[in-house]
Amino acid sequence: MATTEVNGKVCIDPAYNVTPNDSVYFDGKKVKLIEDKVVYMLNKPEKVITTVSDTHGRKTVMDYINSKFRLTPIGRLDQQTTGLLLLTNDGDLHHYLTHPSHMVAKDYEAIIEGRISDNQRKKLKRGIYIGYKEYGKAEIIKQETLKGRSKVQLRLRQGKKREIRRIFFRLKIKLISLKRIGYSNLKLGNLKVGEYRELNQKEIKSLYKI
């Protein structure tokens, strides 16, 4: 009679809840477990690094998510940038969203000293040199003046490393804070800093409609 072993022990309970981390054998042969595909949205706090683990003991985005799944961040936000970050165990979705050819829209809210002029806005739309043989592009969606400062909503599609910070450096504009508020068809909404939620199937499907 064939037996089932879970983590080296015979299992006779048909209702036993197997997790992706369990080692399962049936009749002496290893069983490959098929994981459910999940996507989480995290509102990343400041001074948290976008990585699965850190050898220097710094806080990572994984410290804020309690999940049995092996998750990978989709793209990254630098330490100082807060806001919307997606994490998933779905390799196909991860590849789709991070592939440069898909030009996924990412919306940010920046607080800056002064304001972006009409001429600078036009330059950003065409693309400006940001160093290392790269050009940064951004679409200014909205700009509001706040007592000598401005709150600017920008949309990026290229995803170059620290692109917005490099753009403002080239424009000689001081960047006070930066928060990602949208990714593809998703919005951060009222998700609090340091909190996360699981996306529903409708939201996951919307990520393919870019």
Predicted regions and their residues:
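Basic, flexible Lys/Arg- and Gly-enriched helix-loop patches that mediate nucleic-acid binding at interfaces
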Residues: 1-210
